[in-house]
Amino acid sequence: KEKVKSVPIVGGTKTPNLEKIRQINPDLIIANREENRKEHIEELQKDFEVIVTEIGTIEEALFEIHEIGKKCGVSESAEKLIFDIQQELNCVPDVKPLTAAYLIWRKPWMSVGHDTYIHSVMQHWKLNNVYNERLRYPTITLEALSLKKPDLILLSSEPYPFKEKHIAEVSKICSGSDIMLVNGEWFSWYGSRMLPAFRQLNAVRRTIGL
């Protein structure tokens, strides 16, 4: 935190201050196709080098670490990080697969489809997404979810901050499933956060579905 205190704030992902970015005159801008608006990216591309990431799988996330490391002249550090992450990927516990739903929002209830990074993480840790046939972040109902009878329902800490009280709310309708609060960072943050996230997932997965 101390290292980034002096880094200027240039707005939000949907509301960047383009003039402030121009004043900083960055060597490289890293954008995300889902988080940033197309018109902002195109405007910045007129004056700066912009890497536009679109990450839907663990493999794509590792590739972007490689690419950004190369662009920033820190390939050795990037490759070391990739190696360490791959070590964790190779340490998935030998546990039985479970069917699972991962909820990200309430009112309306929303889950994740097969073309998301979250889905990729779930699959790697043997949590078979019951919304595998859906795209992106589908709106669902708890009544329909209960008919799918997932072994496990995961309530993420973000973007909706699910709490203990929501377990009771979901269990009233999905009484046949185990319901668990999870740290959203484990499933949805990529880049350098993958390493601590995957360590936690390996530890937690050993305790689920025993």
Label for each model-derived stretch:
Residues 1-210:
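N-terminal ligand-binding lobe of clamshell/alpha-beta domains
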